[in-house]
From Swiss-Prot:
The keyword Transmembrane helix does not apply. It comes from the Bacteria. Belongs to the UPF0161 family. Keywords: Cell inner membrane, Cell membrane, Membrane. This is Putative membrane protein insertion efficiency factor. The keyword Cell inner membrane applies. It is found in: Cell inner membrane. GO terms for cellular component: plasma membrane. Could be involved in insertion of integral membrane proteins into the membrane. Pfam families: YidD (PF01809). It comes from Vibrio atlanticus (strain LGP32).
Length: 85
């Protein structure tokens, strides 16, 4: 079962959903990646929480430009913390 989404992650999701519902339909598809950058950000925030989700989303947005070919780039799976190492 997935862990619940933190309140900070929910706050970070608000502008992403606003973009997906209101801005993206006006400008059309522009993302070079699958899943799209906004969907990637939603998945990253829900899976990894606020801090790591924002970090992963920011890295992804920096890669989304005309000089990058894009392609399939899924959100990395959640790693269990190994405290013995």
């Amino acid at each position: 079962m997935a862990s619940p989404v933190s309140p900070f992650a929910w706050i970070a999701l608000i502008p992403i959903y606003f973009y997906r519902w209101f801005i993206s339909p006006l400008i059309g598809p522009r993302c070079r990646f699958t899943p799209t950058c906004s969907l990637y950000a939603i998945e990253a925030l829900k899976a990894h929480g606020f801090v790591k989700g924002c970090w992963l989303s920011g890295k992804r947005l920096l890669k989304c430009h005309p000089l990058n070919e894009g392609g399939f780039d899924p959100v990395p799976p959640v790693q269990k913390q190994d405290r013995d190492k």
